[in-house]
């Protein structure tokens, strides 16, 4: 990949009941299958939570950049992303779905929707998932 700005590596072992870590051990996290999927659950995370965390942080960063470019500094963007593991009837496997809820302050609903859509077009996670997972955008202006 020729235009790389940043890269990171994560290693997993043990699948959903294992762990994930970076080679330099700055990130080490145990994994657990959720109870809803027949696992033990508990305080450990899972791939869906990790994906939701990364996507929400990335989307919020993209939105903050769009707002900054439009000289808006008081919107206090909050991005909540829910990732669902869904049955995939096409191959009897699984697929992901995403519900992106964004709250912006001090602007009209119309402006909020415009900026969120711009962020959705710009966000690297949105670009990576576009056409691959169902995404629902829900925008609230306060």
From Swiss-Prot:
Pfam families: OsmC (PF02566)
Alphabetical list of InterPro entries matching this protein: KH_dom-like_a/b, OHR, OsmC/Ohr_fam, OsmC/Ohrsf
Residue ranges the record marks as coiled coil: none
Single GO biological process annotation from the record: response to oxidative stress
Family per similarity comment: Belongs to the OsmC/Ohr family.
Name the record gives this protein: Organic hydroperoxide resistance protein-like 2
